[in-house]
A protein has these predicted regions:
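Bacterial N-terminal signal peptides that target proteins for export
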Residues: 1-8
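Bacterial N-terminal signal peptides
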Residues: 8-17
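Boundary at the C-terminal end of the N-terminal hydrophobic targeting segment
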Residues: 19-21, 25
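Histidine-/acidic-rich catalytic cores in large beta-rich domains
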Residues: 26-331
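Hydrophobic alpha-helical elements and their junctions with loops/disorder across both membrane
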Residues: 17-19, 128
């Protein structure tokens, strides 16, 4: 055989395995399959906001943005948002917590004192707001937004009093009139009564979000997974996207919510401070898992419209009044 032809034949053989390896590698870097389950923006009506360099919030109905809020002059990032039944929006954006009317008028604002941060806030009726103030010490506060007076205040433990940013991101009130707090730097979730007494706690790896369920259990977002646990600490179910849905690259879980049909909505945050978004291969912003861990809806909207990173969502398919909660005798 001609030596040159032999060399060409050998090169062809050696390149064949390389080509077969490169193609799957390209597929493995995809953030999600090309065809996504569900109806996109039209799947649900919902409130959407996220930790981003832009403080924006959106209300989506029937697949369209019907209301949006932009706070270009503000500081921080929106970590929490709650849409009240009267249309007002409560947001916590690190350096302040504020209540905004449907006409985008700021009805009430409270700035975080120097050296502190506010990442989570909850309405109690129409007159009170509970918020958690990261700091040294870290505090749970309930303020009357009509009078400006503090109704309740107590300190809560933290792992690192000086590491203000890493203390808390999320808390929620339960039907028992208690407060659930995800202690990120203590690797646990705690339940407090209105006096500040710890009622119970659950060990967690890196808890970001916590959601009380109607059955009395709670959802803990442990960053790599979402666990439903009982009050006694028994794990009822676990969703681990990296193994349960490996085709979807979900690397930064923050919050999860149980939908009325039993499915679980999970957000997937993109860190704008950690890198530039690849708009040719953007990550999903949220997914819905069935109880048997099938994905039935995926939200990925980075253009037309660009919703930005996802942190918090509130499904609006049915009328609700999230302000109808209590903290002890505060209603």
């Amino acid at each position: 055989m001609n030596p040159n032809r032999t060399l060409l034949f050998a090169l062809a053989l050696s390149s064949a395995p390389l080509a077969s390896v490169q193609s799957p590698a390209t597929e493995s870097t995809a953030a999600a399959p090309q065809v996504l389950p569900g109806k996109g923006l039209a799947q649900h009506d919902f409130l959407y906001a996220g930790e981003s360099k832009n403080r924006r919030a959106f209300i989506i109905r029937k697949g369209q943005i019907v209301w949006s809020y932009d706070d270009p002059a503000g500081r921080g990032e929106i970590s929490d948002a709650v849409l009240l039944s009267n249309g007002n929006l409560l947001i916590a954006h690190q350096y302040a917590v504020k209540l905004i009317s449907p006409e985008k008028k700021v009805l009430w604002n409270l700035d975080a004192p120097k050296g502190t941060e506010i990442h989570t806030a909850m309405p109690i009726g129409t007159e009170h707001v509970l918020y958690v103030q990261n700091g040294d010490p870290a505090l749970v506060k309930v303020v009357n937004i009509k009078t400006g007076k503090t109704k309740k205040e107590f300190p809560v433990p933290v792992g690192n009093p000086k590491g203000v940013h890493g203390q808390f991101r999320h808390g929620r009130l339960t039907s028992r009139g208690t407060l659930l707090l995800a202690h990120m730097d203590m690797k646990k979730v705690c339940e407090f009564d209105v006096t500040g007494k710890e009622v119970r706690s659950w060990a967690a790896g890196n808890p970001w979000g916590v959601t009380p369920l109607k059955n009395g259990n709670i959802l803990i977002v442990d960053r790599p997974s979402i666990r439903e646990v009982t009050l006694a600490g028994e794990t009822v179910s676990t969703i681990t996207p990296s193994t349960d849905s490996p085709d979807f690259k979900m690397t930064s879980l923050q919050m999860a919510w149980r939908l009325p049909n039993g499915n679980t909505l999970v957000n997937n945050w993109f860190n704008e401070w950690g890198g530039k978004l690849d708009r040719t291969n953007p990550p999903v912003q949220a997914v819905v898992f069935t109880p048997d861990k099938n994905i039935v809806w995926v939200l990925r909207s980075w253009e037309n419209p660009d919703l930005g990173p996802a942190t918090t969502m509130q499904i609006l398919d049915e009328p609700g009044a999230p302000e109808q909660v209590s903290f002890g005798d505060i209603k």
